[in-house]
């Protein structure tokens, strides 16, 4: 378990050292706040050289407000996954992630 206080799970944690020590090269990421924690961890992991799978249907987020505009969670989620896919990660379904781990 890695306790974190930052959006990026690699920032100010031992995560990178733990992964290196274990010889891990591929990460499967999912979680809450697709547009924040999942995105930050995905970008950082990719920048550090990891192969990253983001399990899109195992992530979620919330509506975002900016002034008088509310962006629905589904749009935030889809836009974030589209940004990450094929640039920082491969976005997959739960079934695809499980098959990749076999």
Residues of each region from the PLM?
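Active-site-adjacent betaalpha module
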Residues: 1-102
């Amino acid at each position: 378990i890695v306790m974190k206080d930052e959006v990026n799970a690699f920032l100010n944690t031992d995560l990178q050292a733990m992964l290196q020590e274990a010889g891990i090269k591929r990460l499967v990421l999912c979680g809450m706040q697709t547009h924040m924690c999942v995105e930050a961890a995905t970008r950082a992991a990719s920048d550090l050289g990891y192969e990253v799978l983001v399990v899109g249907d195992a992530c979620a987020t919330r509506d975002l407000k900016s002034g008088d505009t509310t962006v629905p969670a589904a749009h935030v989620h889809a836009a974030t996954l589209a940004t990450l896919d094929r640039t920082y990660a491969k976005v997959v379904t739960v079934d695809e992630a499980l098959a990749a781990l076999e």
